[in-house]
Amino acid sequence: MYNLDIKPEADKIFRRLSKKNPKQLGIIDKKLLDIRSNPSHEYKFLRSPLQTYNRVHIDTHFVLIFKIDHENKVVTVYYYDHHDKVYDWKP
């Protein structure tokens, strides 16, 4: 299983989400466990200029942006937001 690294921007979002919507945070945790246990699954890459990042839809309206480092066996979570806003994110 790969290790998990959550960037400060995503951590701030998850802390706020734990107070407002803990059910959705549980769904995110379950998806992250799935990603960490099966990182060879073909998760979609984003388009340019974010082409090095992967994405996965959570629930129906939200997107999680992450990267998988196969050399160091680390999944890094960068951002999470509504699908209308998430693609405007600048790393």
Question: Can you say where each PLM-predicted feature lies in the sequence?
Answer:
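Basic, amphipathic "hinge/linker" alpha-helix immediately C-terminal to the N-terminal HTH DNA-binding motif
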Residues: 6-10
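Short, solvent-exposed positions on alpha-helices
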Residues: 23-26, 44
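A short, surface-exposed loop/turn module that caps and links secondary-structure elements
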Residues: 30-56
